[in-house]
Amino acid sequence: MKCKTIQVLWHGKDPVLSVDFNPATGQLASCGTDREIKLWRVGRDAEGNPEVTHEDTLTAHTKTVNVVRFSPGGDALASGGDTGEVLLWRPGVGSTNHHGDATSWRQSGVLRGHSDDVFDLAWAPLGVALVTGSVENTCIVWDVAKTKGVFRLEGHAHYVQGVAWDPRGEYLVSQSGDRTVRLFASRGVPHPIASPRWCKNVSCQEILSRGEENADPSAAPGTARSKPGKQALYHDDTMQSFFRRPAWSPCGSFLATPSGTHKEHAGAREQHVTYLFERDKFSRPAVRLPGLSPAVCVRFSPTFYAKKDASATTTTPTTEADASLVPAKPYRVVFCVCTTDTVTVYDTSETTPLAFIGGLHYAAITDAAWSPDGMTLVVSSSDGYCSVVTFTESELGRVLTPEEVPEHVRGEMPEVRVRAVKEAAERAAAVAEEKREATALAAAEKEKAAAAAAGAGAELPANGPRRVAPAPVADANANANANANANANAPRRVAPVPVSEPAGDASAVPKRIAPEPVADPATTAAPAARRIAPEPM
């Protein structure tokens, strides 16, 4: 095992609040109070030491980003933050962030329903829906395809600080600062997740809040402390952490809840614990895992490991329960418990830790994530850094192939789950394409039938009945007035009147006077001048 706190500016020295691995590509996503989501490539150098390379920065949030989670198929990313922002991202080229840099992911949707901070979210199997937990004391189930809320889970009296979705699709888990864990389920005939009928049957099936408390052996007989009683299972809202992130094992057989507290008896000192419940047996924890400080999150490795030899297995019984209460499985599941300052790695075959890591960070741990191959663990912290822990096969065990895993849990392996999600998406696309083709064909047939009907009406036989289009009847008075006005303005022909001989006195009849030509002054000689003799006075 090698552990290293990577000295890079993950989010500009701001707190890193969540991390998650893409199950399909192995890409790491991180988010924090700088309002950005960053994508990294985690690898190992020539000496086997962990190293990271920055690949993308996604910018669309306007406030702190509290959680980021990839879908089970790795084809989508969901992020939740302050003021109720929940954004969906999908791979896409040609996009740029607010810094002007090209990105390989684009924002594909916004889920609007919360009015206050979202602390945690979890995807449903096959990525058809997701659930978010908010400081409004409620959770919302979202239909991812329609980008709308379909059901609100209520009942908590304080902030919802963690949620988890059963990989078998039956249970929804929410954990709150009110010291309770609630399990919701849709009972009755199975229906598709997030469908209207599924939502109609969802209700709270279990509330985990109280556990058994042993009698105080030092108490006087007959007193209250001398009798067994009940105690709270979880810390109250004075626990200094924004997150209480529960988790399901990849096979769905176990539920782990952090932020637990336990007393051996009424007079004993309170201990910090993490509870491991067996599926459908939530009345009491199967295993109680102690810690030095309050646990804030639990994360399971997505792979299954081969069982250890019986001689190599050691079991440390607990007062609450013994490891023998955990049913034997043909495989092992590995998980980590993160407290505010330590990381402890366990597997389901024993209660003795496989690894214990402390002193990684100067501030509280906020989240953790396992790589798809189950050999790398990344831990985030409020001090602005992330630590990478790498394991070998000799430390965790051999990872089983899909053929070695029981059939009923084979579908939860990362490579099988990614393939199943891809096939489901292809089937959905094929069905949608068939519907589009059927709609287009129906429209074409309808148009063809309408054209045929129109053509048949135009080719009726000559001796058959025909429809005569009515013609409007003109107003006779209006036509007459119009003609009169038109004739008044048009030129008229005057009929000639013949001239006849006058009957009677010829002198009374006007005579025709022959015209006389006027002499041309230019050609006519002027009369000769005459001398006028003067007359004597």
Where does each model-flagged region fall?
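Structural hallmark of WD40 beta-propellers
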Residues: 25-29, 74-78, 87, 109, ...
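WD40-repeat beta-propellers
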Residues: 19, 37-42, 68, 86-91, ...
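WD40/WD-repeat beta-propeller blade-loop signature
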Residues: 5, 12-15, 24, 54, ...
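Short C-terminal beta-strands that terminate individual repeats in beta-propeller domains
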Residues: 5-11, 47-60, 96-103, 107-113, ...
